[in-house]
Structure formats: C-alpha cells, structure tokens
Amino acid sequence: ALMADKTFNLQIISPTRVLFDEAVDMVEMKTTEGEIGVLAGHIPLTTILEPGVLRIKTDGNVREAALHDGFVQIQKDKVTVLAESCEWPDEIDANRAEKAKERAERRLTSGSKEVDMVRAELALKKALIRIDLAGKH
C-alpha cells in the first residue's frame, strides 16, 4: 500500500502549451547521457533531453509522446520537462512526418555544407521518431 503513494507531479511544457500536468508513477526519457527512468524521490537533477520518446507510466497505463529537444528539471516531488516541441501520437501527422523524412534524406544525399548535414540528420531523426510513434498507435 505504501508504494501507491509514490507518485510525483509531472509537467510537460512546450512554448505553445502545457501538454501534461498530473501525478504519475514514472517517466522515462532520453537524455544526452542515455535513457533515464524517474521515480518519486529521484535525486534532484537538471539535464538536457535528446529527441526521443517520452514514456509516462501511471497505474499500469503507459502514455508516450514524441519529444524534440528540451531539458528536464527533476525535483523531489516534481518533474518539469521543458520541450522545444512535444506531441502525442494522435497529433502526429504520419504523412507529414514521411514527407519530412524524404526531405531530410534528400538533403543528406545532396551532401552540401557540413552544417546542413547535421541539421538534416537531426530532421531525419525527428521524422523517424514521429513515424515510429505514429505507427505504434
């Protein structure tokens, strides 16, 4: 029964809106250091997030969101994710993501300046995350 109290407040905020603000059991995300799973009482930490899938677990339910760049601030009983952009699977337009993937691949094969390569690779990574997530739901 004690474990039941082990929730914490998770807030996911993007520049345009608050996507999520409720009590959760666990959140998993991808940081520059690798995947982390945060439970209640985690040590305070502020770290940069990589583009990836953010997984929220509450009462055995799992919700996933595609997160693109941002950072997370972990406090004793609260976790705040500030994301450049974050989308729920049902908001992801799979066709748009496919097109973005094609565009990114074209840019990668055209092989222009270095800077563009990095940007194109990132765009490709984002598109693939979106396609992956949209395909699962």
Residue ranges with predicted function:
Residues 1-3:
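Short, Lys/Arg-enriched N-terminal segments with co-localized hydrophobic residues
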Residues 87-137:
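Acidic/glycine-rich phosphate/pyrophosphate-binding loops and surrounding catalytic core
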Residues 5-7:
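A general secondary-structure signal for short beta-strands and their flanking turns/coil
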Residues 9-103:
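Compact, glycine-rich, soluble single-domain proteins
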